[in-house]
Amino acid sequence: MNIKEAIHLYLSYKESLVEKIRDVRYLLLRFERYINPIVELDEIKETDCQNFLNCKGRKNNNYTRYWDYQFCKLERFFVWAFSRKFIHSIPLPKIRPTIRHDFTPYIYSTDELNKIFATALCYRQRYNIEYPYVIQTMLKLTYCLGLRSGETTRLLVEDIDLNNDLLYINETKFHKSRLVTANAPVMKMLKLYLDWRKSIVKKNHFVNNHLFLDKRGNGVPQHELQQAFRLICTKANIVRKDGKNVRLHDLRHSFATHRLVKWYKEGADVQTLLPILSTYLGHSHLEDTSIYLSMTHELLDKANIRFKTYVES
């Protein structure tokens, strides 16, 4: 059995379990192209897998979390194949490197956010499959509501409740669902977008119910939104001071941090409001939200002032 046939069987198996396979399909098809689709599965060597993992999983001679992510996906595939006697051994590296999880989120300033949103409308010179207006709206919504990028890309039209200013967030990171409230400017943005979307759907006879569509009428996938974001930041000349790559997920970190700064400026009881923010973001543990308290110097300064006032009173 060659690698192409094996991957097809594996993805069909995953689908039969009603599992989400979009991300694993993307990875395995990339692995298939890297190795060669007609290579026999049992002929894949450990060095082949090692080179594939290193191709996108190493940076500056350091192993990244993406290396580990790729390894886990490939391991499940090969364990499945081994259990069915499609291979005699698992060709993955025997020793997994230690992955450093010390990545510091980047908090975008208001000026940087404005540049990102403006550049989203003109970041490509040539024809591309995404509507710039769609990408801009997706980025704005991701930041304004603190969404995970996958939550944004999975939104359906029926998830938007214009009458009650609510969004239904389904299929989250922890397989939970939640309701997210939105303020008037965000709902106005969504209403304008839905009106535009309706005209595009009618003109092109699209039938897909995803909220955000590309020019083929398909939902914009997460990896395309991430790629668009990187291109936008490059064109807008937005770079991290530590030399690391910009990340779409940092829009979510920026939302949470900016919200905490605003509460401190308003004199609100942040410790009381923190659980509310945690629920809003869909965190499973309050500790996941508390990390934002030390995310910026401005936030620490505000906290120190509040503490000093408390001590002196």
Over which residues does each language-model region extend?
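Conserved catalytic core of the tyrosine transesterase superfamily
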Residues: 1-313
